[in-house]
């Protein structure tokens, strides 16, 4: 497990791999927005709100802990590891009613484009997970020599995480391998170029 990034709207980003039979066992939390992005394998979720679900690659699972809840994550396979990212954000208001959401995104949804997977709870999209904070998260799969440009607000902050799936990208003038991350501020655009035969999977965080 690695703690990465910096404290932007009190966000913690955790990259996890569980081998078979590994788990987080019933952790108790309140006043956190917690979402998991499954990269490979199967992740089993259980919580004190009676939610039980098996998550696979492409799934995003979200829990707003609000006034308080308990949850656990297990490797859902007895033979293969699971690799996922879990992000924790303090909500814009305290002691909200706990809630649970899941969304699924295909490879085509992310291929050579920015797929919005997490957005503020303002009704701007029905497909993404709704979060109680001014945060947007995009997922992408960028093929070799393909280019994408993201227009930025110079007053916001941006975080890029490249998933460790074999791909590489060039972000502006910086090369990023799998597992690498970059923090960007005071910019009006980000330029991404795929640099490997394997499509690069990455997440882009747009933060207040």
Language model features by range: what are they?
Residues 1-208:
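Jelly-roll (double-stranded beta-helix
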């Amino acid at each position: 497990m690695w703690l990465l990034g910096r404290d932007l709207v009190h966000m913690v980003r955790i990259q996890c791999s569980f081998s078979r039979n590994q788990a987080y066992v019933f952790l108790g939390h309140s006043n956190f927005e917690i979402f998991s992005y499954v990269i490979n394998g199967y992740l089993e979720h259980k919580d004190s709100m009676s939610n039980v679900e098996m998550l696979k690659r492409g799934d995003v699972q979200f829990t707003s802990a609000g006034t308080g809840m308990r949850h656990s994550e297990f490797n859902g396979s007895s033979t293969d590891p699971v690799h996922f990212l879990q992000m924790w954000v303090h909500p814009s208001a305290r002691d909200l009613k706990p809630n649970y959401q899941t969304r699924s995104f295909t490879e085509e949804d992310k291929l050579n484009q920015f797929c919005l997977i997490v957005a503020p709870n303002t009704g701007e999209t029905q497909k993404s997970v709704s979060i109680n904070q001014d945060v947007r998260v995009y997922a992408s799969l960028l093929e070799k020599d393909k280019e994408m440009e993201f227009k930025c607000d110079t007053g916001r902050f941006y975080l890029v995480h490249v998933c460790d799936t074999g791909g590489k990208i060039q972000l502006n003038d910086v090369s990023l391998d799998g597992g690498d991350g970059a923090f960007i501020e005071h910019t009006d655009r980000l330029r991404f170029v795929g640099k490997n035969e394997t499509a690069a999977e990455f997440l882009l965080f747009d933060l207040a």
